[in-house]
């Protein structure tokens, strides 16, 4: 009988939460999460343009080109796996802050490296941060937004993320057309960092 009362109270609490309106504080948090997604998407997408330029400048073979193109994705996978454990242990806000810090610093350091292997290392470490960032906005939305607005909010945030993947390619194409290749490959990293 006592268990039923506890379950009933929890169900009432959840249904009350779902009826709460979206307030300005929630919108601010969602806007920050969307901005983080834009920066993360830029960071992940910048390698597509960069790998073609570095292949030409550094005379990279197929194995090196493949490693450069995938090293950040490998980092993302490992970072995503660690996100849940770290968020439960240290809190989502703290993990989000440090993950953004990690991918920003290592992205910014990428063009400062003049060696292929150091650039690969920077991209891998940046990917670890990006991977830890990726699930957190979805977790926050599922907790902050009531059931009636949750689907629309997910759709908006996902649309922003997907549209943001266009930014690094556009910026990279402009940089390659405007600057010498030795400079052009560095610019997306500096902007993304």
Task: Enumerate the predicted regions with their spans.
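Transmembrane-helix signature of 12-pass secondary carriers
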Residues: 1-193
């Amino acid at each position: 009988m006592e268990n039923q009362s506890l379950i009933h109270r929890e169900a009432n609490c959840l249904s009350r939460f779902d009826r709460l309106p979206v307030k300005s504080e929630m919108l601010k948090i969602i806007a920050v999460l969307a901005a983080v997604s834009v920066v993360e998407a830029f960071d992940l997408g910048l390698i597509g343009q960069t790998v073609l330029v570095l292949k030409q400048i550094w005379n990279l073979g197929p194995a090196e080109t493949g490693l450069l193109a995938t090293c950040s994705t490998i980092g993302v996978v490992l970072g995503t796996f660690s996100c849940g454990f770290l968020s439960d242990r240290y809190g989502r806000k703290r993990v989000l802050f440090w993950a953004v810090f990690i991918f920003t610093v290592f992205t910014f350091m990428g063009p400062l490296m003049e060696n292929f292997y150091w650039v690969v290392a920077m991209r891998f470490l940046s990917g670890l941060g990006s991977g830890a960032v990726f699930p957190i906005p979805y977790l926050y939305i599922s907790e902050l937004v009531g059931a009636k607005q949750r689907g629309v909010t997910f759709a908006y945030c996902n649309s922003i993320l997907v549209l943001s993947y266009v930014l690094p390619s556009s910026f990279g194409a402009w940089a390659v057309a405007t600057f010498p290749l030795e400079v052009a490959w560095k610019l997306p990293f500096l902007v993304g960092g």
